């Protein structure tokens, strides 16, 4: 049986309400296509409010307090815990990762065989996007492969206003790409997602698009400011799409505790499963058995 490749795209700080729905103003034809052809989880709740605990949970399906250890003033992934990526490696997958240098501390070199870190100054529109495309097209990735891409481009919103305009994408200057800078950056990211997706064979590749956590920056109505952090920081988006595999054309679903989505992917793609995890598996949702997860 031919094993399916996995393109695992994580957009750091991508809020759910800015990914899907009539209130978003960004222009995202490629993200929209993934949602239309895949399974979109409308209310995915993150496991933490920072990158390292969230990513650690994604890789292990454990809560951050279970899979992280303290190293001085910082936390890192417990090296004694096997990650889902390790199980993919053990089942013949060639694992690759592109991530910002700050993620080194998680232990990415121990998790993935091939790592490609980039500096904080590098974004999709000034070299990183082309570098990712080169990785996909230079024939160094052996099938079946798993390619984890962690994009920090949304953090541009935290730059001072003038610096944001100076180093940001062309879309950030044009209102047609969104009502605020946050959504215009999303529009710019979507352009590069389209270029990346053009370089893979969707007939034999499962595409996962998700986030680690939300972010507070953006446009809010007065009512939004009254909501608890759960609404603007902990709700993120998650989409699992394989346009050529009808089993995943299931429309919108409700899901919580997002880290468990790697469990059914492991089981379906490589006959792998974990016997230790604190999240509910999404397999029944992906197979159409459950319409909602409570």
Name each region found by the language model:
Residues 1-294:
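Catalytic domains that recognize anionic headgroups
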């Amino acid at each position: 049986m031919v094993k399916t490749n996995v393109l695992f795209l994580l957009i750091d700080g991508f809020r759910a309400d800015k990914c899907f729905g009539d209130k978003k103003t960004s222009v995202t034809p490629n993200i929209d296509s993934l949602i239309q052809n895949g399974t979109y989880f409308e209310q995915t709740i993150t496991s933490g409010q920072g990158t390292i605990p969230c990513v650690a949970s994604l890789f292990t399906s454990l809560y951050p307090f279970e899979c992280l250890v303290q190293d001085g003033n910082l936390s890192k992934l417990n090296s004694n815990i096997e990650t889902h990526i390790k199980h993919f490696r053990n089942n013949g997958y060639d694992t690759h990762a592109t991530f910002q240098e700050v993620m080194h501390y998680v232990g990415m070199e121990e998790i993935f065989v091939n790592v490609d870190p980039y500096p904080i100054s590098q974004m999709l529109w000034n070299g990183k996007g082309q570098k990712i495309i080169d990785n996909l097209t230079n024939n160094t990735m052996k099938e079946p492969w798993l390619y984890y891409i962690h994009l920090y481009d949304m953090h541009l919103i935290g730059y001072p206003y003038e610096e944001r305009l100076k180093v940001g994408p062309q879309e950030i200057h044009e209102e047609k790409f969104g009502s605020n800078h946050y959504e215009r950056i999303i529009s710019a990211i979507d352009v590069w997602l389209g270029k990346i997706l053009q370089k893979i064979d969707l007939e034999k590749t499962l595409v996962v698009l998700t986030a680690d956590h939300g972010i507070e920056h953006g446009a809010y109505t007065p009512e939004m400011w009254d909501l608890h952090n759960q609404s603007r920081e902990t709700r993120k988006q998650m989409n699992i799409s394989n346009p050529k595999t009808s089993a995943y054309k299931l429309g919108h679903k409700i899901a919580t505790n997002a880290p468990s989505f790697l469990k059914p992917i492991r089981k379906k793609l490589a006959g792998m499963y974990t016997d230790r995890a604190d999240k509910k598996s999404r397999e029944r949702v992906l197979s159409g058995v459950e319409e909602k997860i409570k």
